[in-house]
Design a protein with these regions (language model features):
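Acidic, low-complexity Ser/Thr/Gly/Pro-rich repeat segments typical of extracellular/periplasmic
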Residues: 1-173
């Protein structure tokens, strides 16, 4: 019989690990048709037209990354898109992940979720909890635009913060 995990210790964290992989579920994505950067050519992740991006929210600087699909998934529908930073991210720093111009195996564009489309296209959802998130999403879109990422190209975008040095080390010392 399994024992439920107590998340109390994780809830004390002020951000994510600086070396953690980034994951998203993107049904039907084809990395080759999308032009996703692989580990063999990570410098392409800095290209203006890179479809999968990790951007420093403060500076707009693109980060070196590569992408792959989860090879351990039990079905193609369950595969996660894994985005791997090529080096550890800066502590206490906010980053933005942007996925754009994604394609399926036939080369057809993937459509964003209805909620993300509503944020991206400035459509009112009429749902208060979603609308409360809109200012944060608008900030993400503005930062991406300054970094040269067109809003209308986006399939999905979100931000996260890397944990502080104190948070990472304090319980060890």
């Amino acid at each position: 019989r399994s024992t439920p995990v107590d998340p109390s210790e994780w809830n004390r964290n002020d951000g994510f690990s600086p070396g953690a992989m980034i994951m998203a579920h993107v049904p039907r994505i084809d990395l080759d048709r999308t032009g996703a950067v692989r580990i063999t050519d990570i410098a392409r992740s800095l290209a203006e037209d890179a479809p999968i991006l990790l951007i420093d929210a403060e500076t707009g600087e693109r980060q070196l990354i590569w992408s792959e699909l989860d090879a351990n998934a039990t079905s193609p529908e369950g595969q996660a898109l894994i985005i791997r930073p090529a080096k550890n991210l800066l502590e206490s720093r906010r980053y933005i992940v942007a996925l754009r111009n994604l394609r399926d195996a036939d080369g057809a564009p993937l459509e964003p979720s209805p909620l993300f489309r509503a944020y991206r296209d400035k459509l009112n959802t009429g749902i208060e909890v979603y609308e409360r998130r809109r200012p944060a999403m608008e900030d993400i879109f503005a930062r991406l635009e300054r970094a040269g990422v067109a809003r209308e190209e986006l399939f999905l975008a979100w931000d996260f913060t890397v944990a502080s040095q104190r948070n990472i080390t304090e319980r060890l010392l």
